[in-house]
From Swiss-Prot:
Amino acid composition bias (Basic residues), ranges on this chain: 10-19, 31-40
Role noted for this protein: A GTPase-activating protein (GAP) that modifies Der/EngA GTPase function. May play a role in ribosome biogenesis.
Species: Escherichia coli O6:K15:H31 (strain 536 / UPEC)
Keywords: GTPase activation, Ribosome biogenesis
InterPro entries membership: YihI
HAMAP family named in the record: GAP_YihI
Compositionally biased region (Acidic residues): 147-159
Name of this protein: Der GTPase-activating protein YihI
Biased composition (Polar residues): 49-58
Family: Belongs to the YihI family.
Gene Ontology molecular function terms on file: GTPase activator activity
Taxonomic classification: Bacteria, Pseudomonadati, Pseudomonadota, Gammaproteobacteria, Enterobacterales
A family per Pfam: YihI
Region Disordered, residue ranges: 1-98, 144-169
Amino acid sequence: MKPSSSNSRSKGHAKARRKTREELDQEARDRKRLKKRRGHAPGSRAAGGNTTSGSKGQNAPKDPRIGSKTPIPLGVAEKVTKQHKPKSEKPMLSPQAELELLETDERLDALLERLEAGETLSAEEQSWVDAKLDRIDELMQKLGLSYDDDEEEEEDEKQEDMMRLLRGN
C-alpha cells in the first residue's frame, strides 16, 4: 500500500500561502508611497532650515540667499611684506655674573647629582649638561680661575715636603 500523501505534507514543509490580488496591490501602493518621499522638503530655503548655524549673538534669522560681506579687491594689490622685528638680545652678563648663575643653576645641580648617583641621562640631558660644563670651563679660563689650581697647590706642597725630608730640614 501507498502511504497517504496528506500525512507527509502536514509533517513536512507547509506550502506558502499565495497572496491575494488585493494584498499585492496594497504592498505595491506602499512601495510607491515610500519612493515618492525621496528628496528635500518643499520650501526648506525660505523656512529657515538651519537655525543653529550663523546665530552668533544675533536674534534676527539670517537669510541663506545673501552671500558673504567680505570685500573683494577689484584691482591688483601689492603684497605688503611684514617686517620681522629683531629679537631682543639678551643682556650681556659679565663673565663673573654668568659663572655665578651657572654655579647656582638648580637643574644643572640635580642632573650632576643624578650622574654621581650612577644614573644614566637621556641624550638631550647629557648634551645640555656637557654644554653648561663647557661654558663654565670657558668662563673660568677667562677669569683666570681653575679647579686644577687647588690640586696643583697641594701637589706643590707635597713636593716641597718631600724635598725637605730628603734634605733633612
